[in-house]
Amino acid sequence: MRFNVVLFMLIVALLGGLSTCSSEVPIGFDTDELSFDMSLVLLTGDMQTKASDPNYTYATTEELTIQNCHVAVFDKDGKRIYFKNFYSKDLGEMKTIGNLSGYELQLEGVRTFGKEDKKVSVLVVANANNANNSPFDNLTTYDGVDNSYTAKTIAKGPVTASLLVKIGKSETTLKYNQDNAPVTVSLIQLSAKIEYTGVYKKENGELLEGFSLTKVAGLNASSKITIFNTSAVENGAFSDLAYPTTKPVTFYTYEISDAFKEVILSVQSGVEPKEYPFPANKFIKGNYYRIKGLKSSTEIEWVLENVEDKEVTLDPFE
């Protein structure tokens, strides 16, 4: 099921000031009257766990949070013509827009280098920036071998619910000297969410006390953002991440295609914890999973449940 963080809106109508932005101007262009202001509507899907917010079936407020955001605009050839970074001080407080939670932002002065209608693409990567800078600022194109977004690896473990990386893209046509409609960008969680629910008696489903999750190892802390090229796994990046005993029973991992990688749960019910492996390639971006044990008299059978089995597919840039 999709980590569709259901209809979480980010209507982009600038709060100004300390965010960073850049319009990248080709040599020889007259920049007078060749720019637009753009408003964005960011939609995030529902991540599946009971939430206090009545407008979301599962996602918690933390899982919907955006603490920073990188927005890039590309021309029809995939060359970046503009980017802007937003941080928490620029985003302001999450607010209600319609009956949904969101933020208001705006892109100012997007130069499109000509007065004819311009088709552009917008890419949004949320919660992937560093404290005071973005790993995307020096990139120049959407696709390619070097200095491109599709070649970029996000080396950041999705450790906390409030910093889950979200990504989305959209296309629009900008019309010169007109009010342009807000651009809608649907965001998806780049990680999968996993919840350990405990060990139960197999015969009657009764929760057994005395079993505790002490560690989770083998989680993927790195991902590329090439998820728009095809619905297949393309991240090709892996960085081992382990949750110590102080972490909760809900955790997150980026998708990985390597069939030999394993997510390993250490569960204690006596003096020594026992390790239980799960194939890491079973955990797909934008999905929510529950893991539970069913104990018979001799062994524990582990069940991996996809809360709602919906494929996450995203169209490529045209």
Curated annotation (Swiss-Prot):
Leader sequence residues: 1-24
Any one Pfam family match given in the protein's UniProt record, by short name: Fim1F_C
Record-linked Gene3D superfamilies: 2.60.40.2580, 2.60.40.2590
Propeptide intervals in chain numbering: 25-50
Record localization: Fimbrium
Chief place of localization: other
Keywords from the UniProt entry: Fimbrium, Signal
Domain of life: Bacteria
GO CC, alphabetical: pilus
InterPro entries named among the record's database cross-references: Fim1F_C, FimA_N
Family under the similarity heading: Belongs to the bacteroidetes fimbrillin superfamily. FimA/Mfa1 family.
Function: Putative component of the fimbrium tip. Fimbriae are filamentous appendages on the cell surface that mediate cell adhesion and biofilm formation.
Subunit structure: May be part of the fimbrial tip.
Protein name: Putative fimbrium tip subunit Fim1F
Species whose genome carries this gene: Parabacteroides distasonis (strain ATCC 8503 / DSM 20701 / CIP 104284 / JCM 5825 / NCTC 11152)
